[in-house]
């Protein structure tokens, strides 16, 4: 299938009608935000209890989780490896509901339940400007992708535009009749702004006319989330409090039968006074979630839509394959009872699928894709997480290193499992002719996962030697074993080669 960019004039082919995958975090709490990373390799989700979870964007498997709960009004900076590098304490006096970056990425805008918006300098970590004017909680904000223009939506039903240089409110829109839940500028057509509200409608505004040109109807419950497609400027997706997911095409009204069509303001001789055109969904996924959809976000390539919900699930949606129509009978379109009656879904299969997902999550954790604790200890330079197999390493302690005091790992492919034998007497004779006080080239019993074998041992299996017999042979030839420090002791005192022994015990954490 071609990517959406290859069919730029056919947005209908990009509508994500098919359920692709679902994921649930280990805390099993509501998902309040979902965001793809800029390159689209991972998806970051935020939980109701203050947890961030990272999901693989290809296999959709769980990677890691970080508990970031803190005080209301705090803003925290995080690195991609989940190191908390800075915290702006008391950035607001109440919960922060939304953030938006400036086009230059040097400043960001925050919206809070304390009725204010603030512009922060990212480097200085200080509030440059405070925007006041809303009379109730500010639920959403956005920064225009190319211009010095801000927008905010509030519980006072108002949409306000702001000048970031003067902190002055430029104008206020009163089109909505309930809380404004989302305000988003289009990244493709910078003249358009979309808003959603608890009045069960979404609206599209033209900034050149400073008025609404489209009203998106069809939802039976308040709209809680909205997103633009990153490539098609006419495709908008909305999520509702009843768990429904609707997709709208701004150039296709899709009116119900019997309803009189309305004309678009652009096609009217008097665009300023023509009522906004009413648009109905081009596609409905009525049972996308079983509770409120709090957040929606498109993959940067525009082929996968992620949704986060109060039902604790993060779900992924994609286009249907050419000729595929079976998705219309799945449980997300017709409901669980109807799907079960038609044989397209069974409750037993759903429970089994849940168990398999939980088992997969447990397996991911067992493979070192585990919780990252919020600690102040820094990782080793150049090593963001512990190398595989070193999760329990503690310098200077009696903890087991891989291959020391533990069973030998499985041999590499193409290598015999049996180790070559050597006569201890012959080895003692060889050692007696050499300087026994230089063990620096003495190879380890096994390679440490994540680190290459020493050059002298590349491709060569370690020797299987009876150390007790070797000690007897050395003593019989007058060689004192005390000159040979044990490998375990040398590792315990000097640490791993190339790493300082002063590494704190909590460097490697699970």
UniProtKB/Swiss-Prot annotation:
InterPro entries: Pfs2-like, WD40/YVTN_repeat-like_dom_sf, WD40_repeat_dom_sf, WD40_rpt. Gene3D superfamilies: YVTN repeat-like/Quinoprotein amine dehydrogenase. It holds the Pfam family WD40. GO terms for biological process: chromosome segregation; co-transcriptional mRNA 3'-end processing, cleavage and polyadenylation pathway. PROSITE patterns: WD_REPEATS_2, WD_REPEATS_REGION. The keyword Repeat applies. Keywords: Chromosome partition, mRNA processing, Nucleus, Repeat, WD repeat. Disulfide bonds: none annotated. WD repeats lie at residues 26-65, 91-130, 133-172, 175-215, 218-258, 288-327. Required for 3'-end cleavage and polyadenylation of pre-mRNAs. Also involved in chromosome segregation where it has a role in chromosome attachment to the mitotic spindle. This is Polyadenylation factor subunit 2. It comes from Aspergillus fumigatus (strain ATCC MYA-4609 / CBS 101355 / FGSC A1100 / Af293).
